[in-house]
């Protein structure tokens, strides 16, 4: 373990600037990859598919249009969809009923649709709607809209539009709420022009956009073209008879603040009454965050004085803005005073770790260990449970070379005070640090933990590998795998290799991921469905969509990847 820690600490030290991948990664010229090397790797992948997967093997889910894998779980094999067999049985039963000419139960079918959406099995959810319609059942409007919304949230706007068109062809008109989901989906994809054209078509159909429609368009406008263009768009909407609400103006306030145009935001804020709107707590919070960030404390105080009740009474968000800003500017005493005021007076908000973490982070950055301990003791006394942000704040003590042991003692003390299982608590801390890209602190604390008897398991090593990959230190991640291989107690598992493969696929180095895959097979680690799903998604992520489809079809025929995973990948990358 000490060999591992020493070898990786030297690479992960924040003093070695700039951070970049070295070793086998750095020897490959930029842009070297591509179709040929991936194609060669594909042959090796297909050659490995000699064993049929058991139904228990889980598929790794990559959701969102920007291809963001879910790294929140501790292990790639953890599958939140523990009831998938029941869903499959229920779906098969529904299909049998309808094909047999029977009408299914509306409530049961609707619940199945919701459950499939929650399990990210959207293609089957669409099929449920189709089966209901073909059997003469009118789908519940809220369930139908929910499915459209889920498709759009995951970037599958094309599928959502096709579904809406099919439903309309069958005589099921959509309402503004459903269309708003489509507008929002298009806006999320950065397609403002397409969104505007879509809204025009809706108006020609006789559907009137509402204030939420305008808010989605305005947000897309300031993100794509700047806030001035968003203001022009709002003016056009009003000229055409549109009636925006306060949410629309709050969007513009946010746009000005994100562009650092605090004075313009304040000017618009003061114009709200003349436009027929009374600012609410959201409006005030937007301005307050901007003023505090700029250190304009007198103006912030004046704004706070106006928040005297009703819709503009301070919220827990208001207090957290103040605490975060004060701590950021080094005013920790004032931040702590605001913390105390949160639970006094008429409001008495419940304090959480989110409120304490900025103060702890600042104190750790300044190396004030005694005050950190005092603050954490106060948290525990107030039954405020530390979270991932707390651990990362404490991890920043490791930036002071002389404070590493103090950081460990604080972590150790937190474990004892919360009466946690030490092994599980340490594992959680390391995972939290790695997830946020604080791998250097993770290794330093891990070294102290092992000196006190902590024995890292495969889960912990996967967290380290993912953390190193997240920070671009692939040689370090490979070193972890190599040292695990030499260890007698903790050989690398399939999950460890999957973590490495995923890290390479995320930076469009699927060729190198194929090499790690080959190493995995050579070392007798049998790939699972997760492994193959990551590789196919990696190929698709490099825009080699035809190759990805061919590989996916072949893997499905060889029964090493299940239909649920196939449906998910096909929808994600439009491989139909």
UniProtKB/Swiss-Prot annotation:
Residue windows of the PPR repeats: 105-139, 140-174, 175-209, 210-244, 245-279, 280-314, 315-349, 352-386, 387-417, 422-456, 457-487, 493-527, 528-562
Protein name from the UniProt record: Pentatricopeptide repeat-containing protein At1g79080, chloroplastic
PROSITE patterns documented for this protein: PPR (PS51375)
Main location: plastid
GO cellular component: chloroplast
Signal peptide stretch: none
Alphabetical list of Pfam families matching this protein: PPR (PF01535), PPR_1 (PF12854), PPR_2 (PF13041)
Recorded family membership: Belongs to the PPR family. P subfamily.
UniProt keyword ATP-binding, yes or no: no
Matching InterPro entries: Pentatricopeptide_rpt, PPR-containing_protein, TPR-like_helical_dom_sf
Source organism of this protein record: Arabidopsis thaliana
GO MF annotation terms: mRNA binding
SUPFAM superfamilies found in the cross-reference section: HCP-like
PANTHER family associated with the record: MEMBRANE-ASSOCIATED SALT-INDUCIBLE PROTEIN-LIKE, OS04G0684500 PROTEIN
